[in-house]
Structure formats: structure tokens, C-alpha cells
Amino acid sequence: MDGNGRWAKKRGVPRLMGHNAGMEAMKRIVIASSNMGIENLTVYAFSTENWKRSTEEVSGIFKLIVKYVRSELAELVENDVHINILGDYSMLPDDSVKSIDKLLKETEHCNGMNFNIALNYGGRDEIVKAVNELLADREVTDGPGISRDVTEEEISAHLYTGSLHCDIPDPDLVIRTSGEERMSNFLLWQSAYSELMFTDTLWPDFSEDEC
């Protein structure tokens, strides 16, 4: 979901208005994806690097999370959308954490599309956490001091998307908006064999017609 800031700059409005427009685009894409029968949709909402932005912008983004849950929860449940969070959202402000907890609880019974929201997420950070979690688990199961090779399957299982967590498949397609042609630390392990699509369209203007 890239291009909110540039969208706002082009219109001479505050960056937070761009993020608000981006949230409206996300609403459209989520429901459209569900209606199209897409089984898994993952969006990059807030990266581990986004903390470097201004306090005002970061705070505004977190307030939008609360706003999104309040306005969209009923429709998500109605459309049988199941929510997963990729990343450590416990570091967010309390009101955002409570809203996300409610979102997860209210949609845990839903069996339709998996809507996966990457929050405080970084691809490298995810891999490091997965390896550390794996090694900690091994110390419990194998005992201290026992060494054996780590496998791809074990790392995959310990990722946020892995079988020990959300258990969602690797993406078939990764779409990057705003004209940038790089992954920017998004699903680095999982997208090894994904098709990549780059579009100049800024995220707030993106629609299902481009898919």
C-alpha cells in the first residue's frame, strides 16, 4: 500500500489525508477481493521502519487503525472475512492494540477470505524471530547443547505466516503500487517464487480493475 504520502503531496494536503484515502482504498480492495473469491489477501500497513517517521504521522496512522475497526468490523464479519496480523502489534498504543484484539476475536470464527494485515512488520525481522523461536523450541524438545541442521521447512513453520502461527500459503502475486520496483522488506522469504507486479498508480487510486 505505497503512495499515500505522494498522493497527498500532489493535492497539496497533509500526509494524514493521504493515509485516510489509503484506508478507503483498502476498504474497497478487501471487499472486492472477497467477492472475487480470493482466498488470501495481505497488505503492508505499517513496517518496522515506519517508526522513523514523524510522531504526528505515526500517531495518525494508529488512530486510523482504531477508526477502521470501528467502521468496518461489522461488514468484515458479514462478508465472512478472517483477520490475521503479521508482526508484533503489541508495541502499538493501547487503544490500537485493543482494537486489533477485538478485530481478531470477532473474526476468528469467519471461514471466508483470510485478510492478513502486516503491522509493525519487517521481512528480515520476521526471519530472525522465526530462527530464534525455532532454536528456543529445540532447546526444550532436544535439550541444551544438542546441535543439528536447521531446515527450510522449520523456518517456514515459525514465520508469522507459518503452520505454527497463521498457517497461510506463500503469495502467488505481489503487487507494488506507486512506481517503486522493490520489495521493501515485505514477505522476503514467502515471495521467493511469487509473480511480481509493479504499477505507477498510487495506492489511494488503486482499484480491482488493475488486478
Regions found by a protein language model. Name each.
Residues M1-C211:
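Flexible, compositionally biased loop and terminal segments
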